[in-house]
Structure formats: structure tokens, C-alpha cells
Amino acid sequence: MKKITILGSTGSIGINALSIIQKNPDLFKVIALVANKNFSIMLRQCELFSPDWVAMRDEKSAHILRKKLKHSKINTQVLTGEKDICALAALEETDHVISAIVGMAGLLPTLSAIHAGKTILLANKESLITSGYFFMKALSSSGAKIIPIDSEHNAIFQVLPLEIQKNLGKTTLEKNSIKHLVLTGSGGPFYKFSSSDLSNVTPDQACSHPNWLMGKKISVDSATMMNKGLEYAEARWLFNALESEIKILIHPESIIHSMVQYYDGSLLAQLSAPDIRTSISYAMSWPDRICTEVDYLNFYKINNLTFFEPDFTQFPCLKLAIDAFSQGQASMTVLNAANEIAVSSFLDSKISFTKIYEINMEILMSSCFSEPKCIQDILEIDRKVRILAKNKVSSLIF
């Protein structure tokens, strides 16, 4: 039985992971759950899974949860704050840690789990793309393992040789007869929109993905295709891939989740219905597979599968992320921080959809940070850029 801690249990990934655990109680046991401030969902999760520990980032939410658990006579211990979250990520009794906290807030807890030698099931791509070198170095020195949850990287992982699966980031694609990886993306809800149409889209429209059910932040990132740019960076680190070894392909139907081109001409792809439970369950059960109750593909009902190259003019955030990766770790940290503020501001209806790119581009172009020498440097860059981005948003409002 695998013992699980979930960082971000009240979000989309966490809720889906728990649904898989609920259907496979003989395979998994929940040890600890971590969330920000949604005590209502956390209370229900405690009632269903009886974790030993819970941590809420928000102190007020932790206080309310303690009262409700006591009233329900549930013995789960409630902690609060970043230090306690990092402690739960490193619990000795935990085998696997699902890293699903949204954004930069997931960095330190994920690193804590890595330093403790856990198997990390990674959904929080921001922790990897902002601290890539330090992240991969910590993996190597601690003996921790990493399995991606993102559907694209999980799809690639599924069709890679076992040697790479066991040693992500430590070997090269060429040594394993791989010519390149193909990251697919749906193009989001706006891939047919004109530039003028994009100026007027609403947060609700941006969060209405045609194929996937996701959280708000990643839904907006999908709509701008920033998400695909971040996934490009994630793939560069995870698979130790060169720039020439990653291709990006728009695939609106979201049936083929990614592909691996081998030197012998074989192109291996992972296909499934667009349901994140497939990749979560594979990460949780690897190297085995378990039942998820995800619908099977019915090829008689699939009229066609379409593909085309991404248009960087229509999706400038994608190009921005690819270029930022080539510039170094500081640039990726800057872009990630600026984007988190810009997306949050759009969701709060403070800025228009097209301003997300403008803010990202202006902050990235105007920032000049030395390459980070440690995690603290990354956190400091992140802190300063968030201030710059918030000031930029304010200047657009007033």
C-alpha cells in the first residue's frame, strides 16, 4: 500500500487524486493533506479519508477547521503556515507526495519532499521551471524520484524506455534512440479568434476550456498558451531535452496527449479521452495501471484528428516562454511571477485578456537579474517581480 501526502488537495488535481484513492482503498492510504484556505472541502476530505495530518496555509482557515473537526470528533491534527506545510511534505511515513499546489507557492514544499527522498508526483510545474537546476540537483543528491502528472509529460513518460522513466533528467534522449518529443496542445478556447476578438474575452470565457476541466489559473494559461510554454520548459528539464528535441503541435481534439519520435521512424503516442484522472492514476500506480472509470476512446465516434503549427503572432506568450527559457533561470522566474500576477488580475477583471501578454513582455524585457545561485535568490527575484507586476497592473487601471 502506497502512503500518500497531497499538497493542494482542495484543487482540481487533488480532488481527482482523492477520487482515485477512494476507488482503490486497498492500494493507497492518505497520510496528510495540504491546502490554502478552503476549509469546507478540506473538512469533507478529512471525513472521507481520515488523514493523520492537515495543514492550511491560511491561519484563520486552520482555526475554523480545527473547531469543525473537533465538533465532528475527527482526530486529524491541523497545522498552519509554510513551515508546517514543508514538514508534512517530508513526513517519514509518506512514500509518495503529490505536488499540486498552484504556482510558486508550491516551490518550497516540493523541494522539502525532494530533500526527504520521496517519490514526487509533479503537477506543480512552476516549482521546476523556476528552480530547474537546483530542483534536478536535489533530485539527484537525495535519491528522490519524479513522475509527471501533466497530461503531456505523463503521455511522454508512458511511452519512454524504462531506463529514462527510472532516471528522468539524468540521461539523454539521443542515447535512448529518441529524435524528438512532440508536445501537443489544444490551442485553448480562442485558437480561432482574431486579435480584435481576443481584446474583449471575459474570464468566464477563458476558463471554459473546450476539452478539459481545470482550475482557473491553468485555464487562462491554456487560453494564452503560456501553459504550453511552461510545459516546454518543464519538458526541457524533465527529459534533459535540447531545444531541437522538442516540437509543439496544436491538436484541438485533445486525444493525442503527446508523442515520442524514435530514430528508427517509429512515432509512439499516448491517446485517451481528455480526463486528467488517466495521467494522475498512472503516476500514482506506476509501474502498474489501475482502473480509473475514465471513458474509453471510441474511434467510431471520432470523425478526425487535426494538427497544425502554433501561431506565435496569435499566441505570443508561447514564444515568450520559449525565449525566456533560453535566456536562463532568472528570466523564467521573472516570467512566471509576472504571469501569475497578470492572470490573477485578469481573473479579477482588472485588466483585459490581451494585457496579460503585455505585462509579461514588459516586465521580462525591463528586468535585469543575475542568475540565481541558490533557492533564496529565486525567491527574492520572485518577490521583486511580483511588486513590479502589481505596479504595472495599477498603472493600467488608473
UniProtKB/Swiss-Prot annotation:
Cross-referenced HAMAP family: DXP_reductoisom
| Keywords per UniProt | Isoprene biosynthesis, Manganese, Metal-binding, NADP, Oxidoreductase
PANTHER family named among the record's database cross-references: 1-DEOXY-D-XYLULOSE 5-PHOSPHATE REDUCTOISOMERASE, 1-DEOXY-D-XYLULOSE 5-PHOSPHATE REDUCTOISOMERASE, CHLOROPLASTIC
Q: Name its GO BP terms in alphabetical order.
A: isopentenyl diphosphate biosynthetic process, methylerythritol 4-phosphate pathway involved in terpenoid biosynthetic process
Q: What's the protein here called?
A: 1-deoxy-D-xylulose 5-phosphate reductoisomerase
Q: Pathway it acts in?
A: Isoprenoid biosynthesis; isopentenyl diphosphate biosynthesis via DXP pathway; isopentenyl diphosphate from 1-deoxy-D-xylulose 5-phosphate: step 1/6
Q: Which GO terms describe its molecular function?
A: 1-deoxy-D-xylulose-5-phosphate reductoisomerase activity; manganese ion binding; NADPH binding
| Protein family membership | Belongs to the DXR family.
The record's note on quaternary structure and interaction partners says: Homodimer.
User: Superkingdom of the source?
Assistant: Bacteria
